[in-house]
Amino acid sequence: MEDVANIYNTVEAKDSIGRYDGKDTMTIGVKKNQDSDHITVSKAVQETMQTLKAQDPSLEYVVVNDYSDQISNSLKSVFQTMIMAVIIAMFIIWLFFGDIKASLIVGTSIPVSILAALILMKTMGFTLNVITLSSLVLGVGMMVDNSIVVLESCFRFTDKGGGFVETRKAAIDGTAAVLESIIGGTVTTCVVFIPLALISGMSGQMFKPLGFTIVFCMIASLISAMTLVPLCYVYYRPKEKENTPASGIMRALQNGYRSLMEKLLKKKAMVMGTAVVLVIFSLFLATKLKTELMPADDQGTIAVTIETQPGLKIEEVDKILQRAENYVTQDPDLDSYMLSYGSSGLSMNMGGSGATLTAYLKDDRGRKTDQVLKEWKRDMQKWSDCSVSLESQSSLGSGMSMGNAEDLEYILVSTQYDDLKKASDEIVSELQKRPDATNIHSSLENSAPLVKINVDPVKAAAEGLSPTAVASQVYMMVSGTTATTLNVDGNDIDVKVEYADDEYDTIDKLQGIVLPTATGGSVALMDIADIGFKDSPQSITKSDKQYQVTITGTLTEGADSTTKDKIQKEVIDKYLSGTISMQENTSTKMMNEEFASLGQAIATAVFLVFVVMAAQFESPKFSIMVMTTIPFALIGSFLFLWLVDCPISMTSLLGFLMLVGTVVNNGILYVDTANQYRATMDFKEAVIEAGATRMRPMFMTTLTTIVAMIPMAAAYGNAGKTMQGLALVDVGGLIVSTAMALLVLPVFYVIMSGKNQDKKEIIDVD
């Protein structure tokens, strides 16, 4: 062999780069099975690594990213939020009643209800995660509602008639007086989640446990309110103080309310007209909101994807990657980073020209991840020798497309590749000139020159060759072949046979390749094939037998909610012709499907609530009265989303679904009380006193629910962003619907009941 070839030991040419904080690494990724949980798997892996290190002290390893840490931190922040909600709820009860015993009564019902819910969750096979724990936080705010209503009613029956009524009788009578209301309110809250159990897709998978968890909480709280609260009331014998921290404010509000309602009942048309205008205005605000599939929580992780020109030597690529490393390491909020290119690292690019730099920010950083991301984008996307895209990573982003309100994505298809390539290049050129878009790229860009060999099947067949056989022989001559494997000192070493590097390094040398034929002769490659240079993209995608190109970009800070439509009309549409059409992108398609599913669930929930109302009041008229609180809630929901600039997402739509079941509770309390008072009072007096009497329990239940959601509405904790939309929708909706239930609902009650009143009552009201 040594007479005809050079034989030597060597190593394979470097075709990948992997570094952690500037040091070369070998990376191992561990993924859990579907039936395992991250925390258990993480502990097992850590124990295994410690065992290996004990066996070989020279082994050094670093845990680059442990997903279980993110889960643990998210669970911790949600658990802290739940504890805060319980404490604040008890404090609010003390403000209104002035007796710590009253707070303890309601506080006792909370852990009992939570434990019952956890038992039912275990029975259903649910796990504790961000979604289910968030539902427990929401449940804390709602599960005290029934207890507060019962407790407040017990206090009223104790003081009824000016004398002391035996505590036991007051507990029984007080509970019985509001029993129908709390059952109706609980049923309406629960039925809205029935559609969640029936829908499929991502919405059903994610939110079904949330819906069931809240239902479990509400059922447990209802049973607790009917049994535990009156029992504790008799046992503790709390006394409502006349001068509580909130009593003076409540008396002033009730007196002011009576005076205000006297005036509003005389201006029914103005009141109803104003309410309708506000609802219409809220719908206008809704059109100004952005949309996204799911909000990403702040996990402090940024993924930087760097695309280099195809064909670059790995040394040139490494220079670009080192520039990226130097840039991110200058950021004071960076904790560590991992870089991978080629087949190295956790993200294998499989020979493409892309590299991934995953940056992990410090836990005690002074800026949010989005702020760091925007700064890096501004600087890194100016680099001319590569294209850079950045995105923050979310714990919910695993296995799920997270549509973003700032993303641009257009998918064009055509049967003619050349037409599609030309159109995509022109679109990219136009978009790059616009001030409202940046980081524009096409999946057909970064084309690299290559040598293309088109084998003529007829000429090849005449020589006894097939195109496949020609390709195989040319590949072996250009790239070499592994002839055998030697075992040296227990190590397997491949023996590769190849021509010298300069044997076929020009197109002329390729054309001169001589191939053996099946007949024992030979033929030059140029005699059976056309050989020439051609620009080609890294990959060509086809969909339904059509060529496909994806054009992506990012909206700038100056863009608004109408920018996407403008780009569509001003740029994209004019390139759509008979041969080129546009497909709905994956994110938009998924978002539309999930939004449609949740929209149907909301519509079904509204119908189910109406059915429950009709069954409870045995009158469509009273059901319609209660249902008016739902459109009123939209005023606050859309206003809060607009003020915080929170996009409409799956979680915010879930908030609207929950709102359907919660806002009607105040309406139920008011209508039920007004109907009871009409039996003993003048019609006008009954309408006004029903609101004045129910003002305190309405405020208490609304406050406890709202306060429980405030940490989520403020995006508190690592997982705060995930459920912020839901909390904002419910907080805003509850605030406005409570005010509307006290101010507008009495007017609507009079309008709906006016035809059934005798002349004296109508005159008295007007």
Where are these regions (language model features)?
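Extracytoplasmic/periplasmic membrane-proximal domains and adjacent transmembrane bundles
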Residues: 1-85, 94, 151, 168, ...
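Helix-loop junctions and hydrophobic alpha-helical segments within the transmembrane domains
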Residues: 64, 71, 75, 151, ...
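Hydrophobic transmembrane alpha-helices and their membrane-interface caps
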Residues: 87-156, 611-694, 699-716, 732, ...
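Transmembrane alpha-helices and their membrane-interface boundaries in multi-pass membrane transporters
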Residues: 139-154, 178-198, 205-244, 357, ...
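Extracytoplasmic/periplasmic
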Residues: 292-362, 417-450
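Solvent-exposed, membrane-proximal periplasmic/extracellular interface segments of envelope transport
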Residues: 316-404, 459-478
